[in-house]
Amino acid sequence: FGNPPYSRASQHEGQYITGMRYIMKHASSMRDKGGRYVFLIKAATSEVWWPEDADHIAFIRGRIGFELPAWFIPKDEKQVPTGAFFAGAIAVFDKTWKGPAISYIGRDELEACGEAFLAQVRQQAEKLVREMAA
């Protein structure tokens, strides 16, 4: 799962590590090899990086807010967290996908799904800790 950076494309040791065009291109090529990727992206269908070849796109109804970690102290008012200023979408790269190519999901439903998933992860983590302590 990822929320890719929208920064300009840059390389490290000859490999692109940022830039949506390259991130989406890499996800697509890894999908062809069996990789499964889910990205929270800007719903910007006119951008050159828009993932036309994604197996599923879910457009999000409602803006998504971003919460910073409790330890983060904004340097100035430019770093104060706000909601996204653009519409969002979820791009799925998974060649085993059997659902529709396009769908819509409300922000509240998406957040509820995320909370349910996190509850399952926490439950399994607690179980693992107990087993390791025994």
Q: In which residue ranges do the predicted regions lie?
A:
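Class I S-adenosyl-L-methionine-dependent methyltransferase catalytic core
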Residues: 1-134
